[in-house]
């Protein structure tokens, strides 16, 4: 059975973009013989405060926890055949994490949202807007 590691920003069924782009296909993929491992960067508790005013400490803590979750995901690469990335694997900084996935030799499917290209220049530097260009250049398959 082929295994797909799905790296996404938000918990399953929480974000409309994820539901519309790929979550609706989970049952079909599993019926076709794929085993899915899903890993969101943000936890449900972080999602609950992410877009609200305040809660800065919870947002920072949730982001740090997300990076630890992604480090743990590197160990899951051995058991998967394909890595499916929706929007980004990590939200900030250089595409180092994405480079590690590339160096693992796993095929990457990159499903990007056009919103990743609508960042202002200073926000793009912080959020790693060039990650999308890196993933577009190095992925085996691109979905837009």
Predicted regions and their residues:
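A short, charged, and often flexible helix/loop element on the N-terminal side
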Residues: 41-72
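Short His-centered aromatic/hydrophobic patch
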Residues: 85-91
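N-terminal subdomain of nucleotide-sugar transferases
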Residues: 1-41
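Membrane-proximal helix-turn-helix segments that form the acceptor-binding/catalytic region
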Residues: 68-80, 92-110, 116-117, 124-143
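Surface-exposed, active-site-proximal loop segments in enzymatic domains
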Residues: 51-54, 122-127
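Short catalytic/ligand-binding loop motif for oxyanion handling, primarily in non-cytosolic enzymes
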Residues: 14-15, 46-48, 91-94, 117-120
């Amino acid at each position: 059975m082929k295994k797909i590691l799905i790296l996404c920003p938000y918990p399953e069924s929480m974000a409309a973009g994820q539901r519309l782009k790929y979550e609706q296909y989970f049952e079909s993929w599993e019926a076709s013989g794929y085993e899915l491992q899903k890993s969101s960067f943000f936890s449900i508790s972080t999602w609950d405060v992410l877009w609200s005013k305040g809660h800065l400490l919870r947002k920072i803590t949730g982001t740090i926890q997300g990076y630890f979750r992604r480090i743990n995901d590197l160990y899951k690469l051995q058991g998967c055949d394909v890595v499916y990335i929706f929007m980004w694997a990590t939200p900030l900084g250089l595409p180092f994490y994405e480079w590690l996935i590339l160096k693992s030799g796993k095929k990457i499917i990159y499903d990007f949202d056009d919103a990743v290209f609508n960042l202002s220049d200073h926000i793009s530097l912080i959020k790693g807007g060039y990650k999308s260009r890196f993933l577009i250049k190095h992925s085996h398959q691109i979905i837009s």
